[in-house]
Amino acid sequence: MEPDLPYPSYHDYMRNCSSQIASISYRQLTDVELRQFQSFCLNQSTDKTFSNVHIITRINGQEIRFDPHSVTGCLFIDDVYLCTSSGFVNYGSDIVLPSMIRNSTLRNCYVFPNCHISQNALIENTIIQTNSIVMGCGRITCCKHSLFGNGVICNMGNETGGLQIPITADLLYNDLEDATSMKPPPLDPSYLDDIRGDYCVIGPNAAVEMCSLIDSTVIGPFAHVVSSHIVNSSVLSSHCNPTKVTSGDIIDSILQWGTVFESGSNCAQSLLCEHTTTSCNAKIVNSIIAPNTGVSSGECNSSLVGPFIGFHHNSVLISALWFYGKGNIGYGANIGSNHTGRLPDQECLPGEGMFFGLGCNIKYPCNMLKAPYSLIASGITLLPQKVEMPFSLINKPSVNDSSVSPAYK
């Protein structure tokens, strides 16, 4: 992911990361550095000779300097490739942290120049790229042959086997038009082979703080991840569109550029497209959230949520394919409120610009694709039906007194 591009290619970034590792030249610690490591810097290793600690001298042909005094109080397990030098790392807009590795356990890692790594319980099978910050974390690890959330099947609509799309980090919402109109083609095996890896990646200028577990995850450049739990996922980010994750729980999912995911929210088997927002304990499962849509407080399950939708209240959206978006969901709306007593084999197709009022109940099956920009009044229970009247107000029947003008009632 080129940091200067607004939406850089994830596929290219993973390939470049692999080639960068392949280009590394390294050496062993000198006798002077070894004495400093053991006595002055108080480092330890499972190998008493520290032969498992390798000092990076070149990356992509560029010579790298090493300062042994910047590595203190660490434990090294298996092969660790280091390159630290005196300097500073930007932390936010007005704070800088010293470049160093301190009080951390590292196992089978690559640490690139000018990083701040401190107070971490265990970092293993991880690539930490230039100008990154990793501090106060529990465990950062990676499984063998991980795909980082790519290829996970997202089942939307009919929960017994509806619209099934394998999500990938480079899947844009415009690309979904073909995928939703026909059975999606299988994934290109070469795409998955190119991104498959054995290492977590923390991209350049990224910051990871106080996370209990980061497992089999790619964190893109300029991303900021705080107090979160992330497993088998990818967090895309760039200098122009940084992604921020705070107090989140993310499993088998992909967050694209500019996403804000915070306030105790959680998602699983989902794709959050660029510039989506998730907050206030929102729950997202088996769903695709289109660009510029916000999910807050509510539950979204097995749904395709189109662009520019306001979903900011305690409400429920289940098994809905809202292709064109641009609508709103009011407080207490239950979209998918009935159950047949059998399998959950029904779905809803809202039209563009639909407005679901406070406390409405939408029973399935429901098709409103040909009723764009219609309003469901507050407290209405909409029985299973197909609506084909655009710009409608759907309300309960009212009784008029012929002797009084309706305007005065």
What are these regions (language model features)?
Residues C109, T217:
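Residue-level signal for inorganic ion chemistry
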Residues P3-Y13, I64, H69-V71, L75, ...:
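Glycine-rich hexapeptide-repeat left-handed beta-helix
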Residues M1-D31:
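Intrinsically disordered, low-structural-confidence terminal and linker regions
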Residues I202, V218:
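Active-site pocket-lining segments that scaffold enzyme catalytic pockets across diverse folds
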Residues S25-R27, V32-F66:
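An extended acidic
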Residues P98-M100, I117, P204-E209:
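Short, T/G/N/S-enriched strand-turn elements that build extracellular solenoid repeat scaffolds
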